[in-house]
Amino acid sequence: MRWKMKARVLSNRRIASEVYEMTFEWKGKKPHPGQFLMIDCQGKTFLKRPFSVNDFEEEKMTILYQVRGEGTKNLSQMKEGDILEITGPHGNGFEILEGKRVLIVGGGVGIAPLLYLAKKVKAQKLYIALGFKRETFLVEKFEGLGEVVVTTEEGSTGRKGLVTSVVEEMIGEVDIVYGCGPKPMLKALQEISMKANVLCQISLEEKMACGIGACLGCACKVREDKGFSYKRVCRDGPVFWAEEVLF
Amino acid sequence: MNLSVEIGKIKLKNPVITASGTFGFGREYSEYIDLNKLGAIVVKGLTVKPREGNPPPRLFETASGILNSIGLQNPGVDAFIERELPFLKSFDVPVIVNIAGETVEEFVYMAEKLDIEGIEGIEINVSCPNVKKGGMAFGVNPDDIFDITRKVRKATSKTVIVKLTPNVTDIKVCAKAAEKGGADAISLINTVAGMAVDIDKRRPVFENVIGGLSGPAIKPIALKMVYEVVTVVSIPVIGMGGIMNYKDALEFLIVGARAIAVGTCNFVNPYCTVEIIDGIKKYMEENEIEDINEIIGSIKI
């Protein structure tokens, strides 16, 4: 039986314009990389909001979020000692294959679930490609976990251009790709990996209501033998094999 | 203390049931609550054949509610009987199956198919478009409600519940048509038709354009309609629409609903059904009420 958790905020800081990192106590179930939490936004929104597990260690959970609306705005104003109401961890996370040459690809705030993954993946070789528009964040936490490449579309930091150009260059040197970010990036990852016959898992996002698989609100189209079907991003995902997703 | 109520042939241990479309087939919520505590479970709507449902996005949050455009995704009646019903039968809770069809014949077909052990009731979703009448919902036409109810009534030995749509001019006429057709009970309301626009794309949020509005935003509408229906029919009424806590539930019971269904609240708080049951018990203790039936219909006007 799963229980509603109350979690005390330990820290909540802005790490880029509109991007925050919040750490809170967590005495619940240990998360698997790629899983998410449903967090009550304190009466500012009707529905809870899904947030990827960014990091977890010794009863401390961290989430990364971008302020997009009333809910996340309210979260951004929470202080140390405030109490969150949370259910989770939810969902089907990354399937970690050991001993592989791994490429982790993140785009913008989509890098959120990838830090915990980078810590947990037991790779023979780990490459990390992080793409941003202009302003970067959290890169320092990935340093030391693997070989990190940073791209910015505007060329403000690291390599100028899309992160997918890095993937195209490196795809021949890896056995599996894990990706999370904007839909166009994920679609490109699908194309690149399928062309190179390399395994690829992507973490998807969709509006959610129940977060546990009952309402069928967060539909995602997936390939089937005879056409397609809709899977639930919250329960069957958020991580899917890239080859099965129909964009 | 007695919380037991009767809806047709179904004896519920308490008046709190789940609303169709918000509880799946019970598997997911069984990880959160003891399903045995529920008065009954109304499972998601079934159709004759499997339905994929509508493309995403299917959800849009509104002030105090949500719009949904799920499109009745379900595995079909046969797969339900084969794969989901055995799971539900492992609990001591009455199972009520919501059925959705495109023609009267489809409703009858499913009612016959579901006349089996383990199922206690059939809830007819008359909010479906009738393809033989240009897509007009069955539930807006009293004659259609009567016709479908009468035929389903003949097709099954189970308790027949007709679920009414609120998107009508006079809900009382619709309720009377269902009763006349032989319904054992009426449940209402289904969702209120609504719409939202994506201001960036300047397109409706849903590919289907229209979605169903539910949540606490619609509770005043639901309560008013339950009140109206209770005054014109003799059969039990199951009230639903925006119930979020035991106080909301009591409002419906006081107005005259024999049971209440919890829907959208399940998304916000997977524990809400058992919390509502506990809240009602506490209210009864505090007010020295021994029998839930003392509360039902006790409104003073």
From Swiss-Prot, chain A:
Signal peptide region: none
Keyword rRNA-binding (UniProt): no
This protein's UniProt keywords: 2Fe-2S, Electron transport, FAD, Flavoprotein, Iron, Iron-sulfur, Metal-binding, Pyrimidine biosynthesis, Transport
Annotated cofactor note: Binds 1 [2Fe-2S] cluster per subunit. Binds 1 FAD per subunit.
GO biological process, one term: 'de novo' UMP biosynthetic process
Entry keyword annotation includes Electron transport: yes
Cofactor or coenzyme needed: [2Fe-2S] cluster; FAD
Organism superkingdom: Bacteria
One Pfam family per UniProt: DHODB_Fe-S_bind
Amino acids binding FAD: 49-52, 64-66, 71-72
GO molecular-function terms, A-Z: 2 iron, 2 sulfur cluster binding; electron transfer activity; flavin adenine dinucleotide binding; metal ion binding; oxidoreductase activity
Family matches, as SUPFAM superfamilies: Ferredoxin reductase-like, C-terminal NADP-linked domain, Riboflavin synthase domain-like
Pathway: Pyrimidine metabolism; UMP biosynthesis via de novo pathway; orotate from (S)-dihydroorotate (NAD(+) route): step 1/1
Binding site for [2Fe-2S] cluster: 210, 215, 218, 234
Domain FAD-binding FR-type as annotated: residue spans: 2-96
Gene3D superfamilies, per database record: Dihydroorotate dehydrogenase, electron transfer subunit, Nucleotide-binding domain of ferredoxin-NADP reductase (FNR) module, Translation factors
Cross-referenced NCBIfam families: PRK00054.1-3
Sequence similarity: Belongs to the PyrK family.
Subunit structure: Heterotetramer of 2 PyrK and 2 PyrD type B subunits.
Known function: Responsible for channeling the electrons from the oxidation of dihydroorotate from the FMN redox center in the PyrD type B subunit to the ultimate electron acceptor NAD(+).
Name of this protein: Dihydroorotate dehydrogenase B (NAD(+)), electron transfer subunit
The organism of origin for this protein: Caldanaerobacter subterraneus subsp. tengcongensis (strain DSM 15242 / JCM 11007 / NBRC 100824 / MB4) (Thermoanaerobacter tengcongensis)
Curated annotation (Swiss-Prot), chain B:
Annotated CDD domains: DHOD_1B_like
Active site, UniProt feature: 128 (nucleophile)
Cofactors: FMN
Compartments where found: Cytoplasm
EC numbers on record: 1.3.1.14
Cofactor descriptive note: Binds 1 FMN per subunit.
PROSITE patterns given in the database record: DHODEHASE_1, DHODEHASE_2
UniProt binding sites for substrate: 44, 68-72, 125, 190-191
Swiss-Prot/TrEMBL keywords: Cytoplasm, Flavoprotein, FMN, NAD, Oxidoreductase, Pyrimidine biosynthesis
Annotated function: Catalyzes the conversion of dihydroorotate to orotate with NAD(+) as electron acceptor.
Subunit relationships: Heterotetramer of 2 PyrK and 2 PyrD type B subunits.
Protein name, UniProt field: Dihydroorotate dehydrogenase B (NAD(+)), catalytic subunit
Taxonomy of the source species: Bacteria, Bacillati, Bacillota, Clostridia, Thermoanaerobacterales
Annotated gene: pyrD
